[in-house]
């Protein structure tokens, strides 16, 4: 019985080895398909500044002349990292929306309605990307996505989520300097001087 079981196991192993070239071929085709989809959907940069580009004069130049600073093809791992970051943002934002239902003094405000009600000069609502709201500041030619505005314990705040690798997260004890510059652009555009940053560890989902 034991010899028969061992023989069956060896047969399965050998069959798996025979199939491995097919599996490897599938994997390579799968990765290439991901890359082709992502790269064919690449949008031409708009001639507007983005808060994240304000930290680098070079990036600002490429943005305003509608050029990609790096025209290389994106590879599947980097595409996946970007997609996972977008997915996490949606989960993090949905968790904020649930806070009021769970008895906490926190209300997630509709950014588009807030902009319209406040009649903020030069601020145009371009649309939605999931829960995020795409805004454009005509005065400064800045286009940006707002994670959200919340009313927490009676005060209004812009809320911004950031995900990062463990190496950065474990030493995180303050808002990143680059993110502070982004916050200034958001604050001046929306007329709100209070911003809450939530950082999440991509590997463990811990938060600070």
Segments and roles (model prediction):
Residues 87, 91, 181-185, 189:
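Short amphipathic alpha-helical face segments that pack within enzyme cores
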Residues 162-165, 201-203:
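A short beta-strand motif that forms part of the nucleic acid-binding face
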Residues 140-141, 175-179:
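Short, glycine/acidic-rich beta->alpha junctions
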């Amino acid at each position: 019985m034991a010899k028969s079981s061992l023989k069956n196991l060896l047969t399965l192993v050998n069959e798996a080895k025979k199939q491995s070239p097919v599996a490897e071929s599938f994997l390579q085709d799968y990765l290439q398909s991901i890359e082709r989809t992502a790269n064919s959907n690449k949008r031409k940069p708009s001639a507007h500044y983005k808060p994240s580009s304000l930290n680098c004069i070079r990036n600002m130049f490429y943005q305003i002349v509608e050029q990609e600073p790096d025209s290389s093809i994106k590879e599947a791992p980097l595409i996946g990292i970007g997609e996972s970051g977008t997915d996490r943002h949606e989960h993090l934002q949905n968790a904020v929306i649930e806070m009021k239902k769970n008895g906490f003094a926190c209300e997630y405000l509709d950014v588009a309605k807030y902009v319209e009600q406040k009649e903020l000069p030069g601020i145009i609502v371009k649309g939605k990307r999931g829960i995020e709201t795409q805004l454009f500041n005509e005065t400064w030619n800045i286009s940006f996505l707002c994670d959200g505005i919340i009313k927490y314990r009676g005060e209004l705040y812009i809320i911004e989520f950031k995900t990062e690798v463990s190496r950065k997260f474990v030493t995180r004890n303050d808002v990143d300097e680059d993110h502070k510059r982004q916050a200034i652009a958001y604050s001046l555009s929306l007329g709100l001087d209070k911003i809450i940053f939530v950082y999440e560890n991509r590997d463990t989902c811990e938060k600070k």
